[in-house]
Amino acid sequence: MKVIFLADVKGKGKRGEVKEVSTGYAQNFLIKKNLAKEATKQAINELKGKQKSEEKAQAELLAEAKAVKVKLEQESTLVQFSEKVGPDGRTFGSITSKKISEELNKQFGIKLDKRYIKLDHPIRTIGLIEIPVKLHKDIDGIIKLQIKEA
């Protein structure tokens, strides 16, 4: 019996795959536990439609990520911060990925989730700093920060 897997089943198939399995296994286990459904023509066409829409959504995300990367690479895109600095040259407050994301949105209108900003630890120094950003699984960018003494 041909089935369409609705979830990953170890040793049998991954979500979205169409495979042949024994009738008893399909009816008594996979279909009962909603791990798969029977592969009728209608169900297969439905699956193809879903896959096309997912591909289209991925392409849109990729295009959006490329556009953000182009904006970030412009020389005018320099995120400005002014922080109070102690006698040792370190800032009193630290600059986190959340702060960077908010300033990027406020100064340039670029909306970027703080989870995309790859910051090992909060920044506590002044000067010009470049921070890597993971915009998409295939696209990386760099945010340039200018931290000045207030």
From Swiss-Prot:
NCBIfam families assigned to the protein according to its UniProt record, in alphabetical order: L9
The protein's name: Large ribosomal subunit protein bL9
Family affiliation: Belongs to the bacterial ribosomal protein bL9 family.
Recorded GO MF terms: rRNA binding; structural constituent of ribosome
Gene: rplI
Function: Binds to the 23S rRNA.
Keyword entries, A-Z: Ribonucleoprotein, Ribosomal protein, RNA-binding, rRNA-binding
Keyword field contains Ribosomal protein: yes
A Pfam family: Ribosomal_L9_C
HAMAP family recorded: Ribosomal_bL9
Domain of life (superkingdom): Bacteria
Single GO biological process annotation from the record: translation
GO cellular component: ribonucleoprotein complex; ribosome
UniProt-listed PROSITE patterns: RIBOSOMAL_L9 (PS00651)
